[in-house]
Amino acid sequence: MIGKITGRLEYRASDHVLIDVRGVGYLVFCSERTLAALPGVGEVVALYTDLLVREDVMQLFGFTTLTEKEWHRLLTSVQGVGAKASLAILGTLGADGVSRAIALGDWNAVKAAKGVGPKIAQRVVLDLKDKAPSVMGMSDTQATVAAQSSDAVIETRAAPSPVVQNPSAQAEALSALSNLGYAPGDAAAAVAQAAGELPDAETPDLIRAALKRLAPKG
């Protein structure tokens, strides 16, 4: 299975791009948010990928971060949510926004995605609420282009390419609260609330804000 692809961006459409890898063109479907973050045509691009194989179709989906890829995998595991709906949700909310919406049980935020109705949105939140803490705790590793190789397809079993580790303040705050003994679901909801109100907060500020929300009322 192809886990990451690096090559030159040949063209972009409304829902996909064509990436040339040593003369072979790979059609990669992406969310609107991911498409907007990609470089211009002719430049080198790197994406984490997920391959969908069915009897009648084989499609490759691309993501700029492992967190986005993991949410796509989880979203498409929900009954009634296909790849198109998953990309719509990720395009509307982004990976962090999906984490916050699901941790807080905010199905209205999920419903804002094109083609996602209230029943599906509620099912997404209900089915994935317990998954949010583990995804929020992931290091948000971003797909990067290795300077020595602009044309390579990297399989998941191959040696890993250089990556930039950038643990988010959200992940660090969640880890700290878990170490303090808070339940994963409670910690995730508190961090999600704090991150929504303080999007640029550093880890210590995010922890303090989350602790205020976890403090007993009264």
Curated annotation (Swiss-Prot):
Instruction: Note down the stretches annotated as region Domain I.
Output: 1-64
Q: What family classification does the UniProt entry report for this protein?
A: Belongs to the RuvA family.
Q: InterPro entries per the record?
A: DNA_helicase_Holl-junc_RuvA_I (IPR013849), NA-bd_OB-fold (IPR012340), RuvA (IPR000085), RuvA_2-like (IPR010994), RuvA_C (IPR011114), RuvA_C_sf (IPR036267)
Organism per entry: Roseobacter denitrificans (strain ATCC 33942 / OCh 114)
Any single Gene Ontology cellular-component annotation: Holliday junction resolvase complex
Query: Pfam families attached here?
Result: HHH_5, RuvA_C, RuvA_N
Region: Domain III, residue numbers: 165-218
Please report the name of this protein according to its UniProt entry: Holliday junction branch migration complex subunit RuvA
Q: Per UniProt, what is one GO molecular function of this protein?
A: four-way junction DNA binding
Chain spans, region Flexible linker: 144-164
**Keywords assigned:** Cytoplasm, DNA damage, DNA recombination, DNA repair, DNA-binding
Segments for region (Domain II)? 65-143
Task: Give the GO terms filed under biological process for this record.
Answer: DNA recombination; DNA repair
Q: What does this protein do?
A: The RuvA-RuvB-RuvC complex processes Holliday junction (HJ) DNA during genetic recombination and DNA repair, while the RuvA-RuvB complex plays an important role in the rescue of blocked DNA replication forks via replication fork reversal (RFR). RuvA specifically binds to HJ cruciform DNA, conferring on it an open structure. The RuvB hexamer acts as an ATP-dependent pump, pulling dsDNA into and through the RuvAB complex. HJ branch migration allows RuvC to scan DNA until it finds its consensus sequence, where it cleaves and resolves the cruciform DNA.
Q: Does the keyword Cytoplasm apply?
A: yes
Q: What is known of its domains?
A: Has three domains with a flexible linker between the domains II and III and assumes an 'L' shape. Domain III is highly mobile and contacts RuvB.
* Keyword Protease recorded: no
Q: How does it assemble?
A: Homotetramer. Forms an RuvA(8)-RuvB(12)-Holliday junction (HJ) complex. HJ DNA is sandwiched between 2 RuvA tetramers; dsDNA enters through RuvA and exits via RuvB. An RuvB hexamer assembles on each DNA strand where it exits the tetramer. Each RuvB hexamer is contacted by two RuvA subunits (via domain III) on 2 adjacent RuvB subunits; this complex drives branch migration. In the full resolvosome a probable DNA-RuvA(4)-RuvB(12)-RuvC(2) complex forms which resolves the HJ.
Subcellular location, in the record's words?
Cytoplasm
